[in-house]
């Protein structure tokens, strides 16, 4: 029998035991994606990197089209390739920085060309550094995101507030923030929290979906556009045909302007 998506199969079998399941995965794309993951796993193994994962999703519906939870080529079982790292919490690194940027743009706390400080910083013994150990003095906010600078983002988080940022992340679909804001502190923006590829892919897909529909809805928003990915064929909902549809609102978690500026920097 075909075994093209073993990690997804194991996940769904555990979540829905004994059920007959139809997924949204496309077999040809699944095989291509898994082959790509396996190829890079072999290439990176010389650097002791043995675990990789990838998701391909339809932004419009959130349907998962390919789900490669880990490398599947024959390998030492001690490397953990049987573990589905799509759903396994990992350090978020710098991947939350665009959400902070968008949140500050939305709230009027920042403009793309506003200068932010990149000088040595110490917060109760926590001294962040940029990846290249260099400080740039003052940089435009959009440059701080493009270069993924650490020090300016820590300053931005201090201004925005950690608890407020956690609420924003949760509202976009992050489910792994289980501790208090005091627990994470300023390190939240530099990987101090764990996230899953599943959540984060859904969050970025939602950002793209909201922005894509902004013109369609003539400057209004549909809260239902913010939702997680699904491994099943998406429910086909009645399309919105009128700008007075009760499902639309003028309020947004993040405005289209904030989303446009943010996504244009990371080329989504």
Question: Where are the predicted features?
Answer:
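Short alpha-helical patches at coil-to-helix transitions and adjacent helical residues
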Residues: 30, 93-98, 138, 146, ...
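Active-site-adjacent helix/loop patches that line small-molecule binding or acyl-intermediate pockets
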Residues: 21, 25, 49-54, 116-121, ...
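Hydrophobic alpha-helix feature that most strongly marks membrane-spanning transmembrane helices
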Residues: 69, 100, 104-105, 170, ...
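Residue-level preference for non-acidic, small/hydrophobic
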Residues: 33, 62, 95-104, 144, ...
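Periplasmic/cell-envelope proteins involved in peptidoglycan metabolism and beta-lactam response
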Residues: 1-3, 7, 14-90, 94-95, ...
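Conserved catalytic neighborhood of penicillin-recognizing serine enzymes
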Residues: 2-13, 60, 110-165, 209, ...
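Active-site catalytic microenvironments for nucleophilic, acid-base chemistry
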Residues: 39, 103-108, 159, 206-210
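A penicillin-recognizing enzyme superfamily signal
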Residues: 23-43, 56-58, 67, 75-85, ...
């Amino acid at each position: 029998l075909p075994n093209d998506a073993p990690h997804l199969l194991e996940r769904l079998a555990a979540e829905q035991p004994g059920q007959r399941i139809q997924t949204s995965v496309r077999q040809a794309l699944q095989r291509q994606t898994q082959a790509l993951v396996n190829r890079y796993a072999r290439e990176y193994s010389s650097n002791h990197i043995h675990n990789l994962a990838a998701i391909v999703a339809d932004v419009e519906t959130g349907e998962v089209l390919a789900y490669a939870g880990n490398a599947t080529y024959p390998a030492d079982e001690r490397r953990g390739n049987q573990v589905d790292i799509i759903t396994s919490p990992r350090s978020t690194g710098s991947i939350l920085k665009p959400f902070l940027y968008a949140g500050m743009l939305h709230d009027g706390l920042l403009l793309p060309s506003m200068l932010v400080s990149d000088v040595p910083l110490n917060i109760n013994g926590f001294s962040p550094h940029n990846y290249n150990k260099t400080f740039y003095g003052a940089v435009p906010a959009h440059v701080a995101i493009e270069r993924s600078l650490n020090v300016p983002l820590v300053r931005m988080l201090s201004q925005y507030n950690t608890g407020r940022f956690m609420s924003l992340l949760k509202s976009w679909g992050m489910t792994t923030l289980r501790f208090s804001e005091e627990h994470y502190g300023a390190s939240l923006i530099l990987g101090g929290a764990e996230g899953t590829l599943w959540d984060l892919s859904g969050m970025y897909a939602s950002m793209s979906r909201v922005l894509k529909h902004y013109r369609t809805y003539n400057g209004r928003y549909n809260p239902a556009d913010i939702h997680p990915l699904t491994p099943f064929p998406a429910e086909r909902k009645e399309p919105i045909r009128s700008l007075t549809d009760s499902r639309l609102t003028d309020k947004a978690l993040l405005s289209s302007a904030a989303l446009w500026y943010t996504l244009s920097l990371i080329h989504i």
